[in-house]
Amino acid sequence: MDKREEQFKRMVLAYLHDPPHKVLDLAEHEEFAKSFIRAVWIDRPEGSEDLRVEELTGSRELYPWETTPDHAAAAADRVIFPNRFAGAGGCFAAPDSHKGIVKHPLGAGEREVLCPATAARAEEELQGSFGGIKAESWREFFFLLWRRWREESAAIDPALAVLPADSRIPDHSIWLHMDLTAAFEACRAGGGSRLEPAFLLFQLGPVQEFIAAARSTRDLWSGSYLISWLTGCAIKAVTDEIGPSSVIFPALRGLGIFDAVNREVFEKVEYKGKNDRPDTLWQRLYGTDEAAKSLFHPTIPNRFLALVPASRAEELARRAEQAVRKELKRIGDHCFRELGNLAKRDISSWRPRWEKQLELMPQITWQTLPFHADLDSALAA
């Protein structure tokens, strides 16, 4: 197994460190997590049914092994109180009442959530929702787990999509915490215990001048979509290396255009369709005209912010830039061929000017910001 596959294997473990219904049974949540890990593990040797999870995964001590990313994610996604019991007055209720309150992270809004009757019932629903996730590699499996588990769970019970990560501070979902934990796991220094995260801000431009050149509504849409598509390709270059959970902004899960740049992963997942005809996950998601409309929405902005390993920040930025240049050249070459077909004559003399224009657009800028090792150095920066 190469280093990237080993990393994604660890990220799957980190992602599953908490079960999505943890808030319904805090005392048993570690056992629930192990149950999910056992159910989805793709490196399953023959006769592994009786193996302990630690033996199955090759992780000597499952929870101590990944608490550093868990603690980093907890610090990032919630307000830290002076002690563990502070702030308990605003708790998410459940389990006996089967009702809980989740709060908006930026405002005073609240929402009542009707929870599954028991934690065991929630586990059953969650197990059933990812039973069909199969993949050939840990990278693809992590992508599908990140992309589909929450969505499939919500289809069974909408409450499973919004259960909070912390019963004392119910203003962010467990899924956000799982995403961040996996993202921090990818930031381990050389695969060791120490985390070395950094922010990567990547941007295409100039957007206003490019959009202003539109002479029709169709031009306006085409320009917006091109920028959105190219940014999606840049994001894919990063997420292929460290997973989609690493992207802080924009929120990628469920965006049609991001699914489109990752189409090959969806098409590898096969099902039995109607009349026993082969079907793919891509067809199930976007096989209808109504669903396919979302593929034409330019929903990715011209920039993204990602949590990346500090030691690889520049490399990942370069990968993203190269992906944009490569995709724009592919699109440009196709357009040039079509232009030649429409002109019905030799236009090869136009090629140098055509390529020069492609070199000038877009302007790509990126910036990295490594996290400081301690509070004093962070405050001094």
Language model feature labels by segment:
Residues 1-381:
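Regulatory and interdomain segments flanking nucleotide-handling catalytic cores
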